[in-house]
Amino acid sequence: MKASELLQKDQAALNKELSDLLKAQFGLRMQLATQQLTNTSQLKKVRRDIARVRTVLTQKANQK
């Protein structure tokens, strides 16, 4: 997800997106631990998406 898309969302939608990404990251980590994960680059993508969402949330909080 692009940062420009995230900037257009409100804080509630960003929190929901963050929650969904954290659940996805947990699932991917469990798949990795049980050796069921074939595409390990998904972990990196999800981790960076989480960072993007948190960055946008911080920016919006600092604007107020």
UniProtKB/Swiss-Prot annotation:
Gene3D superfamilies: 6.10.140.1970. Keywords: Ribonucleoprotein, Ribosomal protein. GO terms for molecular function: structural constituent of ribosome. CDD domains: Ribosomal_L29_HIP. GO terms for biological process: translation. The keyword Plastid does not apply. GO terms for cellular component: cytosolic large ribosomal subunit. It comes from the Bacteria. The keyword Ligase does not apply. Signal peptide: none annotated. HAMAP family: Ribosomal_uL29 (MF_00374). Belongs to the universal ribosomal protein uL29 family. This is Large ribosomal subunit protein uL29. The gene is rpmC.
